[in-house]
Amino acid sequence: SKFPKFKNACNVKILEKSKLMRKIQKKNIKGQRIKWLSDLSKLDNLPSIFIANEFFDALPIKQFIKKNKIWHERYVKYISKIKSEYLDKPFDIKKLEKKVKFKISYKQNFIEYSPLLSKYLKDIMDSIKINDGGILIIDYGYTEKEMKNTIQSISKHKYTDVLKHYGNSDITYNLSFNLISRILK
């Protein structure tokens, strides 16, 4: 190693819930100071630098759409192995705003929100406030205030129909960095 003092001072923690992915990672990532965690409650009380490299876009999201001035939560209705469709059900957006503690619907017609993203950000920021540190988020996203539908399905490096290839593709979305900054306030 070119930086032995730095290497010896670092303790690497990898958050991974999947046993299969842990097995693959342990095979490919070697080091005595590496530990795998299933949740952030197992962190040490030490200064930490969190690196979220395409982490948040893998978390499940909820979508909300305003139609005729009424908010709806978007669901996927399974019809058969080869057919699904969107189903929009009326939703009281104030419930979501109570949860996030700000008016998320202000000047919006579409919202993508991940409850898990909010939870992880809160846990990470609590750790940073107590123990010092920082966070680097590396992901596809946008900074505009107006949220949009960014959900996408990718299979074999090509975009596919989200409703048709969900069992054989990577379903992801672009992060709203504006929303993340609002969650962090």
Model-derived features: positions:
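SAM cofactor-binding core of SAM-dependent methyltransferases
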Residues: 1-43
